[in-house]
Structures are given as C-alpha cells and as structure tokens.
Amino acid sequence: MTDLTLKALAAERQVSVDRLVQQFADAGIRKSADDSVSAQEKQTLLAHLNREAVSGPDKLTLQRKTRSTLNIPGTGGKSKSVQIEVRKKRTFVKRDPQEAERLAAEEQAQREAEEQARREAEEQAKREAQQKAEREAAEQAKREAAEKAKREAAEKDKVSNQQTDDMTKTAQAEKARRENEAAELKRKAEEEARRKLEEEARRVAEEARRMAEENKWTATPEPVEDTSDYHVTTSQHARQAEDENDREVEGGRGRGRNAKAARPAKKGKHAESKADREEARAAVRGGKGGKRKGSSLQQGFQKPAQAVNRDVVIGETITVGELANKMAVKGSQVIKAMMKLGAMVTINQVIDQETAQLVAEEMGHKVILRRENELEEAVMSDRDTGAAAEPRAPVVTIMGHVDHGKTSLLDYIRSTKVASGEAGGITQHIGAYHVETDNGMITFLDTPGHAAFTSMRARGAQATDIVVLVVAADDGVMPQTIEAIQHAKAAGVPVVVAVNKIDKPEADPDRVKNELSQYGILPEEWGGESQFVHVSAKAGTGIDELLDAILLQAEVLELKAVRKGMASGAVIESFLDKGRGPVATVLVREGTLHKGDIVLCGFEYGRVRAMRNELGQEVLEAGPSIPVEILGLSGVPAAGDEVTVVRDEKKAREVALYRQGKFREVKLARQQKSKLENMFANMTEGEVHEVNIVLKADVQGSVEAISDSLLKLSTDEVKVKIIGSGVGGITETDATLAAASNAILVGFNVRADASARKVIEFESLDLRYYSVIYNLIDEVKAAMSGMLSPELKQQIIGLAEVRDVFKSPKFGAIAGCMVTEGTIKRHNPIRVLRDNVVIYEGELESLRRFKDDVNEVRNGMECGIGVKNYNDVRVGDMIEVFEIIEIQRTIA
C-alpha cells in the first residue's frame, strides 16, 4: 500500500492538519504536515484514539442546521434574496457517577461547615449585643436618678433659705414657733423627696428592663425559613443598639443627617466595611469629630419579626416572575417552591390560576382570585329578557346512518329536492329548515350520517328538542345509528324512531325493533317510551303520522321561550362567502333577532346587516326556533358558538378581543414543553414520513370533520400533518404556505383564485379538488400508502432431496438431487434442511443437468447442485429454494 502524507490523511479524515499532528504527538509519534504516514503508524494512531474514546466521558453531540431566505429591499423598488444558514451545536457529556458523588459530598460538607460557622458567629454576636444593651440601660437609669435627686435637693435648700430670711424680719416672739414649723416642713419635704426619688428610680429601672427585653427581642432572629431577602445581619443590630444613646443626645440637631442616613444601605459585606471605615475615621479625628459618631449611616430597615403574609391577587394566568413580585420574594424562591411541588418552570413561564394559587398558599400568603371576565358578565347581564315565556315550535334533528334516507324524508316533508343538490347524494352540512304544518310549525335540522361528521351530529343533538332517528328497514342498525343514539342520550332528548324504506320487499321492521332494544330504545307497545313510525320517503307513506308523533312529543315537553326581548341562539354552521363575507347560520332560541342588532358570537362580533331564511329570502326578524343566515360579523365564527344580542358595539368588541387573548393565553399556558428525554426518545424512533396538507373548505363544519378524519389516518410510519386550514377559496397565501412546507393543496367545494393559480403553476404544486369526503379520504390514504416501506415476503419455489454427494475440484461438494416439488432456479437463496431443521442458509451457486449448466430444473428431474461456501452436504438432506418478493402495504 502506498503511504499517504499527513496532509492527505487529514483531508481523508476531515480534520485539520494541526489537530492530526497533535493526535500523532499524543500517540508518541512526531510528524509534520509533509511527512508520510505508514500503515503501522496508522494502526498506532487508531489504537490511541480508541483508548481515548473508551476512557473519555460519554459524549453526545447534536448538530442542527436551518436555512431560510431573507428578502432585502434595494434601490429602484427591487429586492434581493439572501440565503441565511443558522448552525447550532450542543454537546451533552455523561459524568462519571463516582466523580459526581464525590463532588456532591464535598459540596455538602462545605455547606454544613459554613452553616455551622454562621450559626456560631450569630450566637456570639447576639450574646454580646444583649449584655452591652443591659449594661447601657442600667447605667443610664442610675445617671438619670442621681441627676433628678440633686435637682430636687437644691430646690428644697433654696426654699429653706427664703423661710430663714423671713423669720429674721418678724417678731422675736414668733421665732421659736416658726423654727419648729420650718423643721417640720423640712422633714416632710425630705420624706416626700425621698419617696419621689424611690418611685423615679423604680420607674427608670422598669424602663431599663423593658428596653433590655426589646433589644433582646430585636437582636434574636426568628427561625423563619427564608431570611435571605432582607440582608440584615446580627452585627448591624449590635451596632444599632450601641449607638442608640448617641442618637437620642443628638436630637433634632442630627435629624437632617439622619434623613440622609435613612437611604437603603448596600447589601452584604460592602455595607459593613463602609460603616467600619466611618467609625475608624471618627476615632482618628477625635475631639469634636467624635460627637458625630451617632450620625453615621445606619440601615434604616427593621427586619420583620416574622414572615409577612400578603394578599396576592391572581388572574386567569400569570407568569412566575409576576407572582414573585406580588409576594415580594425572589423568583428563585418561587421556582424552588414549584420544584418541591413537582413542576419545573422558568421565571418567564406562564402558569394557570390553580397552579399559582397552590404555590402562593404553600408560601403562606392569602390568595384573591380575580375574575377577568367581569366586563363579559356585565355585558351579558345587561339584556332585556324580562318578558313572559310563550309556547314555541320544537327543534327536531334528523339523525341516522348514511344513505338511510334522512334528507329524502325531509325532502318529502318540505316538498323540495335537497338531496339532489348535495355532492354524491350524501349530506355534508347541517341543514336548518322550518316547516309549517296543519298542527303548527316544526324546525328541522338535517345532520350528516357519514362517520367523519361526529362533531356535527353532536352539535345537532345539543341544539335540539327531539331527535328523529331514521333507520332503514332493510339495513337495520348501523354504526352511525348507534352513535346517534349515544348523542341523543348524552343530550338528554327524547327519540322518535322513523323506520324508513318500509315499501321495499326485503323490509323487516321487527328486526329493527329488536336491534334498537339492545341499545335502550324500546317501542311503546313493548313498554318503552319511544314512538316507532313506519314511513317511506319515496312513496310518502306514514309522513303525517310522523309529524303527529313529533308534535305530540313536543306537547309533552311543554316547550316555551321568551319571544320579546334581545335574542340569543347558537351557530349551526358558518362559512366565508366571496361576495358577502362571513356568513353564519344561526338558530334563535330566545327573543327576536332583528336586522341591525349588535351580536356577540364567540371570538367575533358585528352588526346584523342582512338576514335570510333557508330559501334565500330576505327577512327583517326571526323569532324562537327559526333558523336564519346572518351577515355582518367580523370573522367566521366556530360552529357551536353562542350568539347573543348586546346593547353596545364597543363593549362587544372588547369582549371579543378579550376572549381571543384569553384563548391564546390558556393555550400557551397548557402547552407542553419539549424535554431532553423526549428529544432522545424521538431520536430512537427513527425517521417518520409526513404528509403535509393545506386544507380549505366551504364551511367550518367540513373543515373540522375532514381534519379529524385525516389525523386519524396517521400511523407509526406515516403521519398526516395539517399545515393550515380555513374556510373560503384557496388564496395566494395558501399556495405560498403549501410551497414553503411542501404540502398538498386540498380544496373541498372551493376553488383557487387567479393569483393562487399563478403560484401553483410556478411552483408546480399538487392541487386537488373534491366535493365528496369519501374520495378525499381515499386519495390521502393512497398517498400515505406510497410512503410505506414494502413488506418483504419469502416464497418457497422448489424443494430437492439429496440422493448422492460428489466432489468437484472447482465447487467442492456437489449434491446429486431429485426435485420433489416446484422448480429449482439458479442464483436463488436456499436453505439446507436436515431432519426438517435448517442448518444452513446461503445461495445456490451451480446448477447442472448431465454436465450442462442450466438455469432451472423442474419437478421430477435429477440435477447437481453446488451450494456456495458450503461443503457439509449429506445424503438425505433437503435443499429448499425460495425467492424474496415485495408486497406493497396499504393504509387500512
């Protein structure tokens, strides 16, 4: 082998020359860039690198590269594109467990030693401060008592001298008597002075004792758990007690300086060192300078004797940092408290109200929960709904399995042809109609029966009073029939069963009754509560009996609603019309909806600019149980949202914006954060193929149903990802999104506009139009099946029995065989079986018949077989020849 130069070896290994030189030096080989490297030196370097890899710590390096395009505007209105590449690299190192335990033990020992030293220093300072405070208090009491006694004695002497002068001016006859009175007065005055002196001394001693107790209480820190917030040390308390007398002597003279001293002192040892420097300078100056000792800067903050409990006001959501500010503690303490509760958070993470309440109460604070929807409640309560309730028409939902004749039954009742207008003859929207009969008005909701429209059927059951369950007499109970029964039971509404297609020869209504009885739907003649009516939507049989049964059930329910006042209702369906804007189909429940009313509908609001009934006719008002289409909303509301008429458009806008913000905050608060464990789990899963789809449909319910159906198709190998979805035609924005994400554009009953078609043609995007949900789901299944890896299957094509063994100088042992089954083909994989046990698996190398090489030998013929790299062939062995075929898998 030709020796490589070190520079060529570095290029081959994709490392720098300097690093390779260093690696050779570490391995004990001195090389330069131009030296040649022999094979022995390569082996030495490889052994050295393997030793380092084994002895070094386990490392995992993750590299990520992201490319994007930035458009920069230039001169002349032109813009240029700049390619931006962001590279990220992270390395995770696994520590040695023994080293980690040793470091943890050293840190624990150091913390315990520091804690012990701190406790001893605090106790020593506390004892010294207490003794000094008691001495100062006793000396002060003695000085005050002595000074007061001297003053009172001087006053008594002065009074005695005045009395003596007066005696000399009076008559000599009264002198003796007055001397006796003066002596008596002097004795009483001395007793009174002594009594007052004793009382004063007792009072001063009591005051000194009380001051000593206060100083002792102040200097002793309470065993509060978190004391690091206040940064007040015991030495500062001792200095404060030492200078207390000096501050009292200074009085008003030092007030100005004390005001400056009340500023917050610096924390930690810097504050102590500054105070020590001030005292040292005062001691060096001496004389008058010493008097300024009492005005040195002191910490003006008094440490609370116990933890301060606050009233913490918490809204719907709050960040960890805001919660810490409300409790006047550090954010790290809140994070520590949440870690004890089992939640790992950051200081900027949003948490919900329940979590914040739990943390605040755990830290000893009182929680006040703030209702952020006060404006919404005020707007909802300010409605005119005080009128009396009147009887209203029932709302009836037609439910059942697909193709059981729900829409055809409703067609006959309405005497129109609605089913022919639906694509594929199946209902894909909720239709709302009201019908005038001889006995009164009935409002019908026609729901889809296809399996994809589960949420639509659930909404129909929630908005209804009576459910008409349509079951085909020739088909019986089907999966969507069972689901409709469950929706009706969940909504708590009565069920009227319409057994349809009774005119068919194979109709069996008794079978329908037996099957429905298994799910709790019993006919009245069997002692149940459900009415069974035999109808035929084609011939019109039993339609009048069905309407009578519906009205009878409505009379039993005694349905009433307020007809006068501000209306409220529910959105049955919504879509975006190109000419009219957002359109919502609303079923009025209470009150009367007028043209021009201000409505609040979920995240949207607006003024009703126009109303149309199900026939497309303009109407000015709609009462209870009447379905109408309204125009004028700010956006397309979600199907199922509550519609409420309010007084003030400005307040309606504020409530709608608040709901949007609240929805976003709650979504962010509950969003799961990706953890390191999940990252490693995703790495082990391997590559998962994704089918990206941008979905646009004509109504909100179809978007919801198609999205749910497509997401349910996902498997472990291929996943469906809805990149974007919405109501309305395919726009240029949708096409750009599909191009950026390599997605399929799917339009359900909508088309692409001119600008979108240009982008689609330029980017060669895959655009597909559908009008039936069956076809859409089937084609997405086919696209997903193409991404599945094929299944490999082994198929046995021939079996030969070894009758004799020959030796060949070229191929070794040659088995003389008789083909007993199938065909033996050359160069196919084989298995050698001995006593029906596989002992070798390899390849058929040589196949001969009468010394001629052949490609295959059929059943019943003799041949010679040479097995590649195998010579242990014995008489009686079986040689099994098979081939591997690929089977294309499909999504079930």
From Swiss-Prot:
The gene is infB. Residues 446-449 are annotated as: G3. Keywords: Cytoplasm, GTP-binding, Initiation factor, Nucleotide-binding, Protein biosynthesis. This is Translation initiation factor IF-2. Residues 391-560 form the tr-type G domain. The keyword Protein biosynthesis applies. Residues 536-538 are annotated as: G5. The keyword Iron-sulfur does not apply. The lineage of its organism: Bacteria, Pseudomonadati, Pseudomonadota, Gammaproteobacteria, Enterobacterales. GO terms for molecular function: GTP binding; GTPase activity; guanosine tetraphosphate binding; translation initiation factor activity. Residues 425-429 are annotated as: G2. It comes from the Bacteria. Coiled coil: none annotated. Residues 254-269 have a biased composition (Basic residues). Pfam families: EF-G_D2 (PF22042), GTP_EFTU (PF00009), GTP_EFTU_D2 (PF03144), IF-2 (PF11987), IF2_assoc (PF08364), IF2_N (PF04760). Belongs to the TRAFAC class translation factor GTPase superfamily. Classic translation factor GTPase family. IF-2 subfamily. Residues 400-407 are annotated as: G1. Residues 88-305 are annotated as: Disordered. Its main location: cytoplasm. Residues 93-159, 166-216, 270-282 have a biased composition (Basic and acidic residues). GO terms for cellular component: cytosol. It is found in: Cytoplasm. One of the essential components for the initiation of protein synthesis. Protects formylmethionyl-tRNA from spontaneous hydrolysis and promotes its binding to the 30S ribosomal subunits. Also involved in the hydrolysis of GTP during the formation of the 70S ribosomal complex.
